[in-house]
Each structure stands twice: as structure tokens, then as C-alpha cells.
């Protein structure tokens, strides 16, 4: 099922778990491609869910979404925005969204600007970590991507849109006010 573009390039969120962006990218290894799916909370730009596999089927993006739901819990009025890839339009993925009360939004066909904040995350991942590396195995790439997301990007990487705070620090500050 292809959903309407409800997000409509409104990349602002007033609270955590209001708008999640999702997409996946590829990392080359000597064993072949490693596919990396990520769910990003638009409020803080925090990677709240991710999955890495040798295949790019619906389970790749479903696992990333399930991690996000497990970490953040079910939220009221949550919007999930992705592209129109077959993984996101699959019956299994759409059922998972519905079962968790999540509204589906999708970019217009072939329009990367409709999910530009997600594209920016992957640009950072590749520029800052994976582009200059040669991974011998998928496991080596998995370990490095995990390190980037969980030990650097979420807790340390500063964002101009967040007042030069990291996603974790931005959320912590927001919880205090």
C-alpha cells in the first residue's frame, strides 16, 4: 500500500515520538552488501531503531521499527514516514504499523527531498564513518555501524538544528523543561 505524503516536508516535531523517519542504505563489504535500516525520531534526530542484514526484505525494516517501538514504547498520534520502497509498502510492514497504532506517510515517488532529514543521517554515517573503510566481513561493518550509531551519533554528535547538542543531550534537556 502506498500512503499519502502526510509529513509534507514538515521536518519539525514538538515532542519525542511524534514523527519518525525511516529508510535504509547499503554498506559494501568483501562478503557483499550489508543493508542498514534506521528509524530516526525527528524531534531529536535520535536513531531510535535500526537493523542490519545481508538481505533487503521487509524483515529488515520491520526489525528496525520493532526496535524503535520496544525502546520508545507505543506513542499516541505517531507518524512514520518513509519512501515508497517495496519493504515499506509490503502487507507485513503495513500490518505492523497498524498493530502499533502508527500512521503511515510516504514520500512522493522518486523525490528524495521528501525525506531529506533521513538522507542527511545516512550522509553523515557514510561521510563520517563508512566511506573510507574497507570491511572484510559483514560482521565487521555491523560492529562499526553499531559503534557509530550508539556510541557516537546518538550520545555525542552535535547538530546545528538542536542548538549544537547531541540527540541524547537534546532529549535530556527537553525532559527537564
Residue ranges and their predicted role:
Residues 1-177:
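Charged DNA-binding/catalytic regions of mobile-element recombinases
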Amino acid at each position: 500500500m502506498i500512503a499519502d505524503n502526510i509529513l509534507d516536508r514538515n521536518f519539525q516535531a514538538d515532542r519525542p515520538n511524534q514523527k519518525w523517519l525511516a529508510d535504509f542504505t547499503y554498506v559494501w563489504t568483501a562478503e557483499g552488501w550489508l543493508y542498514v535500516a534506521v528509524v530516526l525520531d525527528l524531534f531529536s534526530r535520535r536513531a531510535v531503531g535500526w537493523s542490519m542484514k545481508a538481505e533487503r526484505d521487509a524483515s529488515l525494516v520491520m526489525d528496525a521499527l520493532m526496535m524503535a517501538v520496544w525502546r520508545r514504547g507505543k506513542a499516541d498520534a505517531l507518524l512514520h514516514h518513509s519512501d515508497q520502497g517495496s519493504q515499506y509498502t509490503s502487507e507485513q510492514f503495513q500490518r505492523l504499523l497498524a498493530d502499533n497504532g502508527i500512521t503511515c506517510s510516504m514520500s512522493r515517488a522518486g523525490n528524495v527531498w521528501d525525506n531529506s532529514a533521513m538522507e542527511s543521517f545516512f550522509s553523515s554515517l557514510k561521510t563520517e564513518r563508512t566511506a573510507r573503510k574497507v570491511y572484510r566481513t559483514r560482521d565487521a561493518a555491523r560492529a562499526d555501524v553499531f559503534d557509530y550509531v550508539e556510541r557516537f551519533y546518538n550520545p555525542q554528535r552535535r547538530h546545528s538544528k538542536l542548538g549544537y547538542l547531541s540527540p541524547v543531550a537534546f532529549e535530556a534537556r527537553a525532559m527537564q523543561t
